[in-house]
Amino acid sequence: MSAYSTSIAINADQETIWKVLSDVAHWHEWTPTVSSVEVLNTPELKLNNRYKVVQPKLQPAEWTVTFLTPSSNFTWESKSPGMHMVAEHILNPKGENQTELTLTFAFHGWLGKLIGRVYGKTTEAYIQTEAQSLKKRVENQ
């Protein structure tokens, strides 16, 4: 398994951040790491919803929401032969108007180990960019 994580403090309440984070279909509007998101069932974030995500330098991937605590966190997973990817998005309140965002990404499976090594730097850069982009989007609303 190859795993990556980043955290950032955002000067906004959890609910304000969640409104942007949970609007997956519009991520391409605020982060350069997402080119497009195709909603495969309903646009609102809920368990078992599926999204096709296109990212620069990467193959398109279909993601399924597998864990959800509204206004707090969600996990989605993408599976292909030999590889299983898991991404977590976690919000933790740190004060009256500050929230910590933590993003994690893990590659599992025999192919996931190899892909994780090859794309490790890209993955790390992408989750850091996503965290910084979300912070900028929310704080500049």
Residue ranges and their predicted role:
Residues 54-100, 106-111, 136, 140:
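Hydrophobic-ligand binding "helix-grip"
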